[in-house]
């Protein structure tokens, strides 16, 4: 894992098309902004895991979500 230090307002680049900017820090929360092409999905990890689980689980999981 690459570990980088950035201050509020500073940006890091991932490849040529994705930028991540630190927008603010309040306590133990960090607000970041991500600029990426529309064909690149950007999700919080817990949302990504839920999407992946729903895709793997198939239609039977849909009834449990309501």
UniProtKB/Swiss-Prot annotation:
Keywords (A to Z) from UniProt: Activator, Cytoplasm, Repressor, RNA-binding, Translation regulation
MF-aspect GO terms: mRNA 5'-UTR binding
Organism in which the protein naturally occurs: Alkalilimnicola ehrlichii (strain ATCC BAA-1101 / DSM 17681 / MLHE-1)
Main localization (coarse): cytoplasm
PANTHER family xref list: CARBON STORAGE REGULATOR
Gene Ontology CC terms: cytosol
NCBIfam families to which the protein is assigned, alphabetical: csrA, PRK01712.1
Similarity annotation: Belongs to the CsrA/RsmA family.
Subcellular compartments: Cytoplasm
Biological process (GO), any one: positive regulation of translational initiation
UniProt keyword annotation of Repressor present: yes
Protein name (Swiss-Prot/TrEMBL): Translational regulator CsrA
Functional description taken from the UniProt entry: A key translational regulator that binds mRNA to regulate translation initiation and/or mRNA stability. Mediates global changes in gene expression, shifting from rapid growth to stress survival by linking envelope stress, the stringent response and the catabolite repression systems. Usually binds in the 5'-UTR; binding at or near the Shine-Dalgarno sequence prevents ribosome-binding, repressing translation, binding elsewhere in the 5'-UTR can activate translation and/or stabilize the mRNA. Its function is antagonized by small RNA(s).
